[in-house]
Amino acid sequence: MVEKSVAFVEGVSKELYLKTGVRFVIDMTDFEKNPIALATKNERQNYQEGFLKQLKPPFVVFFFYHDAQKIELVANPKDLLDTDKIFFEKIAPLLPTNAKEYTPQRISAMLINGYSVAVDALAQKYRVNITQNFNAPKGVTFVKVVIYILLLTLLGAFLGLYFFKKS
């Protein structure tokens, strides 16, 4: 992750823990700073089990395996967070489709998006306000507006080319 993202995660995690008692950790492997090769699913599961034994519930851990191109979101207790919903609705759409797209900026954006949504869900559950977190509704609205503008631009370009070719 880029340095700004690391600082953001540390600040929000600290505030979340102080207000709710829930630890939120992002664990990234296969990098120079954490060179652990975990190619098979069994290796990743064993690594996760060992990592999770070090934490006391309640906690949420976001595992990111760069080389295997896998992500795992784990909550303990399991009903603490709807991890599947967050993964499939907020993280999966941002997953890179090829190896060239696995840049530090793209990885940071993907992880921060999922992290921020998960923190918002935890804050709502515990009825607290996490002041250092992104305001999710504004971010979602902004992304939707940008996507609509891009779609309308593409549609306009397509229709313009279609009608000018016929003339």
Regions found by a protein language model. Give the residues of each.
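Folded, non-transmembrane soluble domains that reside on the lumenal/extracytoplasmic side of membranes
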Residues: 1-141
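C-terminal single-pass membrane-anchor helix
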Residues: 131-167
